[in-house]
Structures are given as C-alpha cells and as structure tokens.
Amino acid sequence: ATITFTNKCTRTVWPGTLTGDQKPQLSKTGFELASGVSTRGAAPPATLIELTVAS
C-alpha cells in the first residue's frame, strides 16, 4: 500500500505514524512537511495515522 501526506496548511507540520502488528516504523521521530508539499511512501497494512491540529 502507498500513503500520501499532503500539507494544505499555511504552516509546516510534523506528521508522525505508528505501525501495528510488529511491522517496521515508517519514521521513528515523525518528519517535517512544509506548507504545500506532498510526500508518498510505502505503508504496511494496519497503519494508524493520528492528526493533531492546533493553532
């Protein structure tokens, strides 16, 4: 599976992911995603994505 992160906010965001079922993590610390940027990557099944939006 492929997952795409797109930042449509006016500010930089730091997505973080946590995989389940003993699968390798996509990132250990999250990653920077600047405003207007998209990135794609492989996502193992049962990937949880949690978004926290604050101003």
Curated annotation (Swiss-Prot):
InterPro entries given in the database record = Osmotin/thaumatin-like_sf, Thaumatin
**One cellular component term from this protein's GO annotations in UniProt:** extracellular region
Q: Is this entry keyworded Protein biosynthesis?
A: no
What subcellular compartments does it reside in? Secreted
Induction per UniProt is:
By salicylic acid and by laminarin oligosaccharides.
Write down the superkingdom of origin.
Eukaryota
Q: What is its main location?
A: secreted
- UniProtKB keywords: Antimicrobial, Disulfide bond, Fungicide, Secreted
What are the GO BP annotations of this UniProt entry? defense response to fungus; killing of cells of another organism
Gene3D superfamilies the record matches: Thaumatin
What does the protein in this record do? Has antifungal activity against C.albicans 586 (EC(50)=6.2 uM), C.parapsilosis ATCC 22019 (EC(50)=2.2 uM), C.krusei ATCC 14243 (EC(50)=2.5 uM) and C.krusei 80 (EC(50)=5.4 uM). Has no activity against C.neoformans, C.tropicalis or T.glabrata.
* Similarity remark: Belongs to the thaumatin family.
Name of the protein described by the UniProt record:
Thaumatin-like protein
Q: Which organism is it from?
A: Senna didymobotrya (Popcorn cassia)
Upper lineage ranks?
A: Eukaryota, Viridiplantae, Streptophyta, Embryophyta, Tracheophyta
